[in-house]
Amino acid sequence: MEQQSDGLKVMVIDDSKTIRRTAETLLKKVGCDVITAIDGFDALAKIADTHPNIIFVDIMMPRLDGYQTCALIKNNSAFKSTPVIMLSSKDGLFDKAKGRIVGSDQYLTKPFSKEELLGAIKAHVPSFTPVDAVS
């Protein structure tokens, strides 16, 4: 498997295989190194091993939900400055507020577009320059 050492490390945590694959495909096309996790427990071990530059996390997941996962990331001194973007099919004010309380940096509603994903990355990792994908 080819490793892009200069690619931005992006983690996508979602229990939906479709969402993980979609995000992974979109992000790899612009030069990102994508790490996926199926839930918060899976993600925490991978975060410690890979040190992603930005993390996208679904809210509604079994075992350890997105709010709990975000809080654990933000309470860890090694990762508290890592941007965490919440992903949810809900677009409610309460959900967004709860995300802010646990330390999330942004909130994206699913389904998301390539532009929304890249916009979130650019907003929180200003040095990121997407590679132009060949159509």
From Swiss-Prot:
SMART domains: REC (SM00448). Phosphorylated. Pfam families: Response_reg. GO terms for biological process: phosphorelay signal transduction system. Disruption phenotype: Deletion results in decreased cAMP, surface piliation, and twitching motility. Supplementation of pilG mutant with exogenous cAMP restores surface piliation but not twitching motility, suggesting that PilG regulates pilus biogenesis and function by at least two pathways. Gene3D superfamilies: 3.40.50.2300. SUPFAM superfamilies: CheY-like. Keywords: Phosphoprotein, Two-component regulatory system. It comes from the Bacteria. The modification 4-aspartylphosphate is found at D58. InterPro entries: Bact_response_regulator, CheY-like_superfamily, Sig_transdc_resp-reg_receiver. Plays an essential role in both cAMP-dependent and independent regulation of twitching motility. Regulates the cAMP-independent coordination of type IV pilus (T4P) biogenesis and retraction that plays a role in surface and host cell adhesion, colonization, biofilm maturation, virulence, and twitching. In addition, phosphorylated PilG is necessary for cAMP production via regulation of the adenylate cyclase CyaB. Acts therefore as a response regulator of the chemosensory system/Chp system. This is Protein PilG. It comes from Pseudomonas aeruginosa (strain ATCC 15692 / DSM 22644 / CIP 104116 / JCM 14847 / LMG 12228 / 1C / PRS 101 / PAO1).
